[in-house]
Each structure stands twice: as structure tokens, then as C-alpha cells.
Amino acid sequence: MSSNWIFKVIVAGAGGVGKTALIERYVSGSFLEDHKMTIGAQFSVKDVKLDTGEDVRMQLWDFAGEERFRFLLGDYCKGASGAFICFDITDYSTFEQLPEWLRIIRENAGMIPIILVGNKYDLENHEIELATADDYAENAKCLMNVFCSAKIDLNVEPMFSAMAKWLIYYANLAD
């Protein structure tokens, strides 16, 4: 499929929140129980045809969440069209790290569209409520917040499609 649009999208957030699992679910439709820790960054591509009829190539940059790799993120952000910042809804400490991820991305990529992603909805003991994350997303000038689960495939494809549509919208505004 030849793509009308090609977008570089950063996927960032604390270690262990499920960034790689979300990308794997979206790109291949599968969920692996055993994920190896991402070292630096991994790159995946997904070609999609949106319900609008447009062909989009999503270049997904899965960035390691561990503190020791964070200094690299600024370089990976350059040229990004959009970003997902992920947190684990069962671990409040990952939600508390959102301001740092936002700062790094905005300092290096500007005011690109960002979607906050609360992953692991399939698990019990949610420590972050949807309304809290929605308020944070609004105050941080993010496009939206999405609660999802890579494991049970809840809201994964819709959040990536929403990002693609927003990126096309903003690209058309810039023309």
C-alpha cells in the first residue's frame, strides 16, 4: 500500500507500563506475556487505511521508559508528528511521571499532538480514575486520554486511528 501520509509517532512513558505490548497489539494483533525490556528505542511500522479512505504509514518509536535511557528521548523526538505518553492505571507512580515525559517531548518536538494512554485496564485495583486522567489531559493540552488494554485488545486500534486522523487534520492546517 502506498501511503498518502507518513507520520513519526513517539510512544513514551515509564518502564513497565506496556508501551511495547500496545505497539505489538496494534502492529501484529498479538499479545505476548513475556516482553523484554526495551533498550533505547525500538521502531515499528504500520500501514493503515482509515475509514476516511486515506492511507497512512505510522512509524512508531517505542522509547525505553527506564531513567537511565531518558537522556536519549530528546534526540528521538526530533521530527516527531505526534506522541502517546503511557502510564499504568494500576500504578499511580507512573501517572506522576507524566509531567516529565510531557516536558521532554515538548522541549524537543514542540506542541505536537499528544494522547495520554492509561494501559492495563484489564487488571483490578485501578489507582487512577478516568476523570482524573481526563482532567490531566485537558490541563496539559493533550488531545485526549484513553484507557486501554493491550492484553484484551481494548481501545488499542481506536487510539492509533484517532492519532492518525488528528495528524492528518493538523498537517492539512499547515498546508
Model-derived segments and their meaning:
Residues 1-175:
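TRAFAC-class small GTPase G-domain
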